[in-house]
Design a protein with these regions (language model features):
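Flexible glycine/proline-enriched surface loops and loop-helix/loop-strand junctions
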Residues: 60, 187-194, 268
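Internal mixed beta-strand/loop scaffold within catalytic domains of large alpha/beta enzymes
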Residues: 97-192, 209, 330-333, 342-344, ...
Length: 358
């Protein structure tokens, strides 16, 4: 049985950050409004049914001051999204702080697996990087090209209503991210804001500095890779950060800590993330098996890998699981930053990838 055609639309937004947000909100209005109910009914209600939508939105206001302090331009974008979609700002804050709010809800919808390779590991020496993003079924997402007046253009993919942190920019920087589970969270900058801020940097060193110096609310893994062959992985927590350098010009990551001093604090196996160890091992195994031959089309096949199904690199929905655990890969992205290209697909086992260019 063949894969389904990929008819994804690439949305393009330009101007000031407020204008970009307004265009985003207008273009994706129906989806953004639908996602408010999605987050409440599909994500939070199964785990914390006693918490109302109004309470979630009120809690999300805690992100306003951290965002204004560290990334005021994205506060403008979020306000623009609310204006364009015709919804209260608190709804947009709730959607963009959903991963932070989710810390209090013990739900598992599958784990993300990311990778990067360059130099001798790749067929042509160019950097290739990407990931699968796993979440619960029903989440809407979109491919976007963002061209701000005052920074690099971005090409990426995001859940509708959220900022873009999965993709690349026109300076040759790619950024990807994986959830981590750590015993502490604080009132800080939401991970989506940190991710888009990193993706908006003109170089790997500046992206690294941005991630390291922004006070995050929860633990998150950031993988950044550049057209010149620089790449690094940063495991961020509210307390301290761990840094992982390439091994044989390859980095792979899933949803557990790899930095030795952070591993004792890892809680991945306590909230259904046990498969993270197998996914990371499998991705590393595939990349080592094809060392020196790695390129975009081949790594896209890795992202289709179903070993360990339904919780392999490409997660598949299992209707027999409880709703609170039922998830899978909702989108997949592969980038070659030197070429300014991204290949994006819904679940790649079921759909073809579609190529987009900055």
């Amino acid at each position: 049985m063949g894969r389904k055609p990929n008819n994804m639309t690439l949305y393009e937004f330009k101007g000031t950050w407020r204008q970009i947000g307004q265009q985003y909100g207008e273009a994706c209005r129906d989806g953004i409004r639908a996602m408010t109910s999605f987050w409440k009914d599909r994500v939070f209600a199964p785990a914390i049914p006693h918490v109302s939508l109004d309470e979630l939105m009120e809690t999300a206001t805690q992100f306003v001051e951290p965002i204004k302090t560290c990334a005021p331009e994205y506060m403008e974008e979020l306000e623009g999204i609310a204006e364009g979609a015709g919804i209260p700002l608190n709804e947009v804050l709730m959607q963009n702080g959903a991963f932070e709010l989710n810390v209090a809800a013990p739900v598992y919808f599958g784990g993300c697996t990311s990778f990067a390779a360059t130099g001798k590991a790749t067929k042509d020496g160019k950097t290739v990087a990407g990931q699968n993003f796993d979440w619960c079924d029903g989440a809407e997402f979109a491919a976007m090209k963002i061209v701000p007046n005052d920074g690099p253009a971005i090409l990426g993919v995001a859940i509708v209503g959220q900022l873009v942190m999965f993709g690349l920019n026109d300076r040759g920087v790619s950024h990807f991210a994986n959830e981590l589970v750590y015993p502490k969270s604080v009132v800080g900058v939401p991970s989506l804001v940190v991710g888009q801020k990193a993706l908006s940097q003109p170089s790997i060193p500046k992206a690294l500095r941005c991630i390291a110096q922004t006070p995050c609310a929860i633990a998150l893994n950031h993988l950044i890779a550049g057209k010149d062959g620089d790449m690094i992985d940063i495991e961020v927590t509210p307390d301290k950060n761990g840094y992982i350098l390439p091994d044989r010009e390859i980095i792979t990551h899933a949803n557990h800590f790899q930095t030795p001093f952070l591993q004792p604090h890892d809680m991945a196996d306590q909230i259904f993330f046990v498969d993270t160890y197998l996914r990371d091992y499998r991705m590393r195994q595939l990349m080592e098996d094809y060392y020196g031959e790695l390129e975009a089309q081949l790594t896209m096949e890795f992202l289709r890998d179903k070993r360990g199904c339904p919780t392999g690199i490409c997660g598949m929905y299992d209707p027999e699981l409880p709703l609170i655990e039922r998830g899978g890969t909702i989108f997949s992205i592969c980038t070659v930053p030197e070429e300014g290209k991204a290949w994006i697909a819904p679940n790649p086992v079921e759909y073809e990838y579609r190529e987009f260019t900055l």
